[in-house]
């Protein structure tokens, strides 16, 4: 396994862990002028780009993809899109942890699939198995599993108090 590619694949997870466990510090760091969810989204997009570049660095692309690619990628991305559509940026990027009032959502996929955005992301990664070595897909997926576990143990008392 290429060490740099492995580091790139894992890069966002320490950031997500730190935000989840130190929400008030992040809110304070962002200050009154910057929305903590928006700043998190921007940083996350940069980290996601690094993850994707890491995968491309070890990938062997070929066309056409295997048949399993299409349903896994399509449904995985549908779940990601749907979660973002229902929760918005603040709901997707830890808004509740940062002291925002995010309404509870019960529409599909919530209430049917536990952690639908993580499930969708893992499905999308699995779709790429014909191009990317298994160990990188596994490593990235384990990062999501770690975050699902961490977020399932949420302590509401650890939520940040909004400074706005």
UniProtKB/Swiss-Prot annotation:
Pathway listed: Phospholipid metabolism; phosphatidylcholine biosynthesis
This protein's record includes keyword Cell membrane: no
Localization in the cell: Endoplasmic reticulum membrane
Knockout mutant characteristics: No visible phenotype under normal growth conditions.
Alphabetized UniProt keyword annotations: Endoplasmic reticulum, Lipid biosynthesis, Lipid metabolism, Membrane, Methyltransferase, Phospholipid biosynthesis, Phospholipid metabolism, S-adenosyl-L-methionine, Transferase, Transmembrane, Transmembrane helix
Enzyme class: transferase
Primary role: Catalyzes the second two steps of the methylation pathway of phosphatidylcholine biosynthesis, the SAM-dependent methylation of phosphatidylmonomethylethanolamine (PMME) to phosphatidyldimethylethanolamine (PDME) and of PDME to phosphatidylcholine (PC).
Protein name: Phosphatidyl-N-methylethanolamine N-methyltransferase
Annotated source species: Arabidopsis thaliana (Mouse-ear cress)
């Amino acid at each position: 396994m290429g060490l740099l590619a492995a580091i790139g694949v894992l890069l966002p997870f320490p950031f997500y862990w730190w935000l989840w466990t130190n929400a008030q510090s992040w809110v304070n760091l962002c200050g009154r002028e910057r929305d903590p969810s928006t700043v998190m989204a921007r940083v996350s997009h940069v980290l996601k780009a690094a993850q994707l570049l890491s995968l491309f660095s070890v990938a062997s692309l070929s066309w056409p993809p295997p048949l399993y690619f299409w349903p896994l990628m399509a449904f995985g991305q549908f779940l990601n899109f749907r979660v973002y559509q229902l929760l918005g940026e603040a709901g997707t990027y830890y808004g509740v942890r940062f002291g925002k009032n995010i309404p509870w959502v019960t529409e599909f996929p919530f209430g049917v699939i536990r952690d639908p955005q993580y499930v969708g992301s893992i499905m999308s990664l699995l779709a790429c198995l014909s191009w990317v070595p298994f160990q990188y897909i596994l490593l990235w997926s384990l990062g999501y599993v770690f975050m699902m576990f961490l977020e399932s143990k949420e302590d509401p008392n650890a939520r940040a108090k909004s400074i706005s």
